[in-house]
Regions:
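Short amphipathic alpha-helical boundary/capping segments
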Residues: 11, 107-115
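Helix-turn-helix DNA-binding module
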Residues: 113, 117-118, 128-148
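Structural recognition of an alpha-helix C-terminal capping motif at a helix-to-coil junction
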Residues: 22, 36-43, 47, 56-68
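Residue-level preference for hydrophobic side chains embedded in well-ordered alpha helices
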Residues: 12, 16, 20, 41, ...
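A short, charge-rich alpha-helical start-of-domain segment used by transcription regulators
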Residues: 1-22, 26, 35
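DNA-recognition helix of helix-turn-helix
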Residues: 67, 138-163
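Internal acidic/polar
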Residues: 72, 80-105, 131-132
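A short pre-motif secondary-structure segment
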Residues: 122-123
Length: 163
């Protein structure tokens, strides 16, 4: 039975590894800390896997756990470097990369880095194409609250990019 559970979790993880990596990238710019965050997310997913409630979409459940772990990870960041230092380290790290990073995507990440943790979660879900109802379900908020926050974030985004 344990082997079956391990196999199912491995298959599930393979299907959602990009989602997990994306959430971790949004919440953590330092590559080493990001690996730690991804590991924390996977551990929490593993612990919760047996208790998955199939009334929720597996993607919603995954987002909820990944976002909650990421927000908790940020709250513990007081003992780690401040966000600005981490950002500068990330920029230096990017200069050494062999691959070319899409400048527009990187600018979007820079904008998202400036947002509060809850707003980051909302914009991630919005960019993934989630409806206000789905975002509200993942975040445990009202649809109206999500709509208001999302509209404010989009306005900030337009201002940031001078659109």
């Amino acid at each position: 039975m344990k082997d079956l559970s391990d196999t199912l979790f491995a298959e599930y993880l393979e299907g959602y590894k990009n989602l997990i990596a994306k959430v971790a990238r949004i919440y953590c710019q330092d590559p080493e800390e990001r690996r730690d965050l991804i590991q924390d997310i996977i551990v929490q997913l593993w612990k919760s896997f047996q208790n998955y409630d199939s009334t929720y979409a597996i993607s919603t459940w995954t987002y909820r756990i990944a976002l909650n772990v990421s927000i908790s990870f940020l709250r513990k960041a007081t003992t780690r470097k401040n966000t600005r230092d981490v950002y500068h380290q990330q920029v230096e790290w990017l200069h050494f990369q062999d691959t070319v990073i899409d400048e527009n995507l990187e600018q979007l990440y820079q904008f998202i880095d400036l947002l509060k943790p809850i707003d980051k979660a909302i914009i991630i879900l919005y960019l993934e194409g989630c409806s206000n109802k789905e975002i509200a379900e993942v975040m445990g908020m009202s649809v109206t609250n999500v709509s208001t926050k999302k509209q404010r974030i989009v306005e900030e985004l337009k201002s940031y990019f001078k659109i």
